[in-house]
Amino acid sequence: MFKFAAAVILCLVAASSTLAQHNPHWWGNRNTIVHLFEWKWSDIAAECESFLGPRGFAGVQVSPVNENIISAGRPWWERYQPISYKLVTRSGNEQEFADMVRRCNDVGVRIYVDVLLNHMSGDFDGIAVGTAGSEAEPSKKSYPGVPYSALDFHPTCEITDWNDRFQVQQCELVGLKDLDQSSEWVRSKLIEFLDHLIELGVAGFRVDAAKHMAADDLSYIYSSISDLNIEHGFPHNARPFIFQEVIDHGHETVSREEYNQLGAVTEFRFSEEIGNAFRGNNALKWLQSWGTGWGFLPSGQALTFVDNHDNQRDMGAVLNYKSPKQYKMATAFHLAYPYGISRVMSSFAFDDHDTAPPQDEQERIISPEFDEEGACVNGWICEHRWRQIYAMVGFKNAVRDTELSNWWDNGDNQISFCRGNKGFLAVNNNLYDLSRELQTCLPAGVYCDVISGSLIDGSCTGKSVTVDGNGYGYIHIGSDDFDGVLALHVDARI
């Protein structure tokens, strides 16, 4: 009887722990993460203080923090080829990373690290040198900077059948040396790495290539890492937020459902379907049942995004910054509709899949520069600084914990809906104007459309909408308007 009771208690503790790993530990009503892809730590610290904190962003996903192989031309993907767990990359060193985490936490912006637990680097002729000066022999699976030897890896094999679980989880993803997460030594080094980041004050982790690791092995690792550091403002016994990269199009042998109890999961179907809709391949009217009605994961288990650093580089339905009008409409819908744990992308310009981040002649990443309106100008795209996007982060904060109501559509590509009595969104993706009275659900008053302008010193620099005592307002979105979306909320009342 005692053994049974003890087993039940252990199961309850494990279940409680995994549920806690779905909590992003946001400040107040903040609820949007931004991925500052390839930014330097010092620049992220400054961005937290000058822009992200004041604009109400909840957190930052940062690029991998540990030492990586140096590849010719310095493509972005070299960051995903580790050779040690030393915290030295082109983004900065450990001291700069720790300073960034502290400064961002101080202004209510949490840090989530993109971590590489699945693999080390790919093949390299001879001795490879890393960003911290460590040497490795990838062809021999020798990484003295950890240290790892060939005994710590799965046998070399290629993934040729994505419906073969063994290949997916024990062969080499695009030639990257595949770690054996069932090994006690490998587990100990991964846990040590994650614990060090927790000690420095991070709030959680984006787990790269999670589907290529057995869920049982990840469960062991997650349950073995430390609670968050209370010296950085986290409560006692708080568990790291975990969101896992699991690409599952609905017909995968290794499915997202194997991982969603361990932490949140990247909902790639969201990205694909929202791109289809706003590219005009699917009528917006069907978005009324968006979320679980489309076969997506439960809201609290889904990390949602319009694009990410990988799929924005692929041809297909996924939207990116190169289709700005549709991208801004999709992002507005993403942040207005009550589904998922939202992340927005902040990119650098690219012409091909391998383009390096903006860098100088010595191949050092350069800092973003801004024009007089705050937009980036020197190779950084900085979608998070587009007014239409950061304004919707504010919208999402203003309407947090409200329900969707009063859905309207024209049977095609014009839609609107309310978020409680705090927010209203309208979208026009037709080739003709949207001009009509619509229920906004807002209290009577005059509201600034935060898409076309900003509320500054009591005046709106863009469109304004007068809402009557019954909640109705006249909404106009021309087919040739710069933006095909209009957004009102209670914090933008004139």
From Swiss-Prot:
Family: Belongs to the glycosyl hydrolase 13 family.
Residues annotated with Pyrrolidone carboxylic acid modification: 21
GO cellular component, one term: extracellular region
Binding residue positions for Ca(2+): 118, 169, 178, 212
Oligomeric and partner information: Monomer.
Name this protein carries in UniProt: Alpha-amylase-related protein
Regions annotated as coiled coil: none
InterPro entries: A-amylase/branching_C, A-amylase_C, Alpha_amylase, Glyco_hydro_13_cat_dom, Glyco_hydro_b, Glycoside_hydrolase_SF
Cofactor(s) the protein requires to work: Ca(2+); chloride
Active-site residue numbers: 208 (nucleophile), 245 (proton donor)
Reactions performed catalytically: Endohydrolysis of (1->4)-alpha-D-glucosidic linkages in polysaccharides containing three or more (1->4)-alpha-linked D-glucose units
Natural source organism: Drosophila atripex (Fruit fly)
Calcium found in the keyword field: yes
EC number of the protein: 3.2.1.1
Binding site for chloride: 206, 308, 343
Secretion signal span: 1-20
Cofactor descriptive note: Binds 1 Ca(2+) ion per subunit.
Locations listed in the record: Secreted
Predominant cellular place of this UniProt entry's protein: secreted
Keywords, sorted A to Z: Calcium, Carbohydrate metabolism, Chloride, Disulfide bond, Glycosidase, Hydrolase, Metal-binding, Pyrrolidone carboxylic acid, Secreted, Signal
